[in-house]
């Protein structure tokens, strides 16, 4: 296997200039391991376009099709030259793949390049105007036809896609997201952890529900990290710290986030119900840091058969303030339950969701 290129939206190249132990490798999708094991491993990233015409054109196309075509941000000469020399292209999400598709589709169909894409939420049904629905299904069909491997981060979405697009199920693979367990590790005593943490920016998080929790738990200290939350959302409370930003902007370094996890007694992940495996990375990071996770039990949870309620995670049945308050208070009063879950959670992640396992499985998928 040679000439491998990873397609990212952004935020990776700049991190490669940082000291290796200063950032987690989670969102590189094992780029570092491929780089150390194979020759000619490259990265392409999105870059804002200066062309207002292109911006308007692809903005209209996105509106019309509901497909994430951001071609103006990635189809530049530099990236095209890299792709010309690429045999295996790994797109870390469908936005990257769709945005490259006008250039890669011919090379894919002629066997000059094998494109593998990580899927998250692409196949979910939503109510749309019938014209947009037709166009969306058309482009998804072309997407499935032209790409070699479609890699799902959630078993549930994989099963859903197999029913909806059964013709392409031979291209479908399941590979759960994994994290840098060498980075996400805690040396802090469980007894010294006392904060409640929330981390997350995807739109399947239930932010409106979350806003009501701190004021109803005034004796607990909350740390909330999200671009969708501000201090103004919690003006009525004095127990909430909000860090507004996203991973790619480096508002918070990975080391700083790790230190926040190290103060946390619990990690909250309230979700809206969907097939999307929302909260996956935060849950695994928390668990590796020995922070028990409270997560809404949704149909999109990525691998139910590996997790057990109250053994290595806490599945929350509903997003009501009363229910979550009762559960949180119960755990505060019974910290031995939290302690046991934190131990089991760390063990589960170390054994099943480390980057070495992810690398070996991804290598098998793209080699076939």
Model-derived regions, located:
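Membrane-proximal helix-turn-helix segments that form the acceptor-binding/catalytic region
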Residues: 77-85, 130-150
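A short, active-site helix/loop in glycosyltransferases that binds the activated sugar's phosphate group
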Residues: 146-170, 181
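Acidic anion/phosphate-binding donor-loop and adjacent secondary structure
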Residues: 162-163, 173-193, 208, 234, ...
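Conserved donor-binding/catalytic core segment of Leloir-type glycosyltransferases
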Residues: 188-205, 210-217, 223
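Conserved acidic donor-binding segment of nucleotide-sugar-dependent glycosyltransferases
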Residues: 201, 307-309, 313-321, 330-336
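Nucleotide-activated donor-binding/catalytic signature segment of Leloir-type glycosyltransferases, i.e.
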Residues: 226, 231-261, 266
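Acidic donor-binding loop of glycosyltransferase active sites
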Residues: 259-276, 291
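A short, well-ordered alpha-helix in the C-terminal region of glycosyltransferases
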Residues: 323, 330, 337-352, 358-364
């Amino acid at each position: 296997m040679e000439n491998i290129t990873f397609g990212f939206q952004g935020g990776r190249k700049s991190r490669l200039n940082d000291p290796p132990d200063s950032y987690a490798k989670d969102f590189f999708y094992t780029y570092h391991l491929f780089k150390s094991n194979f020759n000619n491993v490259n990265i392409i990233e999105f870059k804002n376009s200066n062309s207002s015409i292109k911006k308007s054109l692809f903005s209209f196309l996105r509106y019309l099709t509901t497909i994430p075509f951001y071609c103006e941000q990635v189809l530049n000469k530099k990236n095209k030259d890299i792709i010309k020399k690429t045999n295996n292209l790994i797109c870390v999400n469908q936005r990257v793949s769709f945005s490259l598709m006008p250039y890669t589709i011919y090379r894919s169909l002629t066997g000059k390049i094998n494109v593998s894409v990580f899927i998250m939420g692409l196949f979910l049904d939503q109510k749309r105007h019938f014209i947009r629905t037709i166009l969306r299904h058309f482009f998804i069909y072309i997407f499935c036809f032209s790409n070699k491997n479609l890699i799902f981060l959630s078993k549930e979405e994989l099963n859903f896609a197999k029913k909806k697009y059964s013709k392409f199920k031979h291209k479908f693979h399941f590979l759960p997201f994994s994290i840098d367990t060498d980075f996400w590790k805690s040396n802090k005593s469980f007894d010294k952890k006392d904060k409640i943490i929330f981390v997350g920016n995807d739109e399947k998080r239930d932010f409106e529900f979350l806003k009501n929790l701190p004021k109803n738990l005034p004796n607990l200290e909350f740390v909330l990290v999200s671009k969708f939350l501000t201090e103004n959302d919690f003006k009525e409370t004095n127990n909430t710290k909000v860090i507004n930003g996203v991973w790619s902007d480096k508002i918070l370094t990975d080391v700083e986030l790790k230190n926040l996890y190290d103060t946390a007694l619990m990690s909250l992940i309230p979700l809206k119900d969907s097939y999307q495996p929302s909260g996956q990375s935060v849950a695994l990071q928390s668990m590796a840091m020995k922070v028990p996770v409270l997560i809404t039990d949704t149909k999109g949870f990525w691998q139910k058969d590996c997790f057990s309620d109250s053994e290595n995670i806490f599945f929350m049945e509903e997003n009501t303030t009363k229910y979550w308050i009762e559960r949180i208070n119960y755990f505060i009063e019974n910290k031995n339950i939290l302690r046991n879950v934190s131990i089991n959670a760390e063990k589960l992640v170390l054994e099943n969701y480390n980057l070495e396992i992810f690398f070996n499985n991804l290598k098998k998928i793209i080699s076939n």
